[in-house]
């Protein structure tokens, strides 16, 4: 229900446009929101889904991000280049950290990467005003939130990967853009992007609004 609620809030607030899309051998249709969140599901149906990785596991198709397409791009420059081309920055990239955990618990890599990024920036966790925690699976995102004591109100305020999709290779840029624009729109100071990576890695980066 959380992804669906976040998605509806976004559509109402930002007035998402209708886009015509075409697919090979499929008629054109109108798309005006992400397709991951399903309004026709319920807790009883979700509870009947089989675990994906382990017979007694908690990860199912119902609490995982969907296969999705997407693209994203960022421009990161030095202060020298900023001045040379008279550019106006949207944010400052404060720090970045990569850490790892045993592969069998790969989803909680951000648990180690977040404190490392905070140390590198000389900042405290409660100074983060907005946190984009990529939820490839709900279980790993919830584990990171619980273990680090993150404020749920600051985590994925506009919905995470289950609501909006997780296009491999683009998620980092998309989540970073989300943070930067949210900081500017809401006049906040610090934002963080963090995600798990296959084989146990975790990454986290901190942005400061300019």
What are these regions (language model features)?
Residues 6-9, 13-81, 147, 152-154:
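N-terminal extracellular/periplasmic Venus flytrap/periplasmic-binding protein-like
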Residues 41-108, 112, 119, 177-178, ...:
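Condensing-enzyme catalytic core mediating Claisen C-C bond formation in acyl metabolism
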Residues 6-9, 86-90, 125-127, 152, ...:
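Flexible, glycine/charged-enriched surface loops at secondary-structure junctions
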Residues 16-18, 94-163:
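Active-site pocket-lining segment
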Residues 56-67, 97, 127-136, 155-171, ...:
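Cysteine-centered functional microenvironments
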């Amino acid at each position: 229900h959380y992804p669906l609620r976040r998605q509806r809030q976004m559509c109402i607030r930002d007035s998402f446009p209708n886009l015509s899309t075409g697919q090979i051998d499929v008629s054109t249709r109108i798309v005006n929101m992400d397709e991951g969140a399903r309004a026709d599901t319920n807790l009883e149906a979700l509870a009947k889904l089989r675990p994906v990785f382990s017979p007694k596991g908690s990860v199912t198709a119902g609490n995982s991000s969907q296969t999705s397409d997407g693209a994203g791009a960022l421009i990161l420059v030095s202060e020298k280049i900023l001045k040379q081309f008279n550019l106006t920055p949207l944010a400052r990239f404060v720090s970045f950290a990569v850490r790892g955990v045993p592969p069998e618990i790969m989803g909680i890599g951000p648990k180690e990467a977040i404190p490392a990024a905070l140390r590198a920036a000389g900042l405290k966790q409660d100074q983060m005003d907005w946190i984009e925690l990529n939820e490839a699976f709900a279980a790993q995102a919830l584990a990171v939130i619980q273990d680090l004591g993150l404020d749920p109100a600051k985590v994925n305020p506009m919905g995470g990967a289950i609501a909006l999709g997780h296009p491999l290779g683009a998620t980092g840029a998309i989540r970073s853009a989300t943070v930067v624009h949210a900081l500017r729109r809401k006049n906040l100071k610090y934002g963080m992007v963090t995600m798990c990576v296959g084989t146990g890695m975790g990454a986290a980066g901190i942005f400061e609004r300019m």
